[in-house]
C-alpha cells in the first residue's frame, strides 16, 4: 500500500514539473489517501495482532 502511495507521489511530482497542475493535485491527493489508509490499517493490525488460542 505504501508502494502505491510513493508511486502516486512520484507521478504528482513529475506532473507538477511538467505543468499539469490539475493532474498533479489529483495524484497528490490520491497519494495522501493511500498513505493514510495504510497507516490506519497498520495501526489496527499492530494493536489487534495475531491471537493464538
Swiss-Prot record:
InterPro entries: DUF1328. The keyword Cell membrane applies. Keywords: Cell membrane, Membrane, Transmembrane, Transmembrane helix. It is found in: Cell membrane. GO terms for cellular component: plasma membrane. It is a multi-pass membrane protein. The chain crosses the membrane at residues 4-24, 27-47. The keyword tRNA processing does not apply. Disulfide bonds: none annotated. Its main location: membrane. Belongs to the UPF0391 family. This is UPF0391 membrane protein YPO0432/y3747/YP_3749.
Amino acid at each position: 500500500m505504501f508502494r502505491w502511495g510513493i508511486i502516486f507521489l512520484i507521478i504528482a511530482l513529475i506532473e507538477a514539473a511538467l505543468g499539469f497542475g490539475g493532474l498533479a493535485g489529483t495524484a497528490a491527493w490520491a497519494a495522501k489517501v493511500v498513505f493514510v489508509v495504510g497507516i490506519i490499517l497498520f495501526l489496527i493490525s499492530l494493536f489487534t495482532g495475531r491471537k493464538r488460542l
